[in-house]
């Protein structure tokens, strides 16, 4: 008899998110990229010990590298542990890298990681092509969110009456 294989549905598990990126940047486009990791880094990510805050990606010599990603050392490893803040290579298609190179150089856009997650057993990074917000833009978006919350509260009260 053959064993039933697990469904081929996309199995994803979120490791960490960069919520501050949505506040500080206007997200224009999103990409999914693989990431080159060491064994202890993957084990540490399975424990959920990562931080995307203040991380960004750069294109150098036709390759994309992620800087500032903090993956805490694996607790059960001995002397073979990894460096927590090392530069990690991202895996993208060549045509995507060319596109990103052009856009980041021309318009002054930034490559910001939004999420780090497991997809079918592999660690993936959701990268965003983003433009930095000015201070007044941030204030405006906060004001808009507060107004929407107030409207929702009023609607809820009317429904209850």
Swiss-Prot record:
Keywords: Cytoplasm, RNA-binding. One of its GO terms (biological process) is trans-translation. Residues 139-161 are annotated as: Disordered. One of its GO terms (molecular function) is RNA binding. The keyword GTP-binding does not apply. Pfam families: SmpB (PF01668). Residues 139-153 have a biased composition (Basic and acidic residues). GO terms for cellular component: cytosol. It comes from the Bacteria. It is found in: Cytoplasm. Belongs to the SmpB family. Required for rescue of stalled ribosomes mediated by trans-translation. Binds to transfer-messenger RNA (tmRNA), required for stable association of tmRNA with ribosomes. tmRNA and SmpB together mimic tRNA shape, replacing the anticodon stem-loop with SmpB. tmRNA is encoded by the ssrA gene; the 2 termini fold to resemble tRNA(Ala) and it encodes a 'tag peptide', a short internal open reading frame. During trans-translation Ala-aminoacylated tmRNA acts like a tRNA, entering the A-site of stalled ribosomes, displacing the stalled mRNA. NCBIfam families: PRK05422.1 (NF003843), smpB (TIGR00086). HAMAP family: SmpB (MF_00023). This is SsrA-binding protein. The gene is smpB.
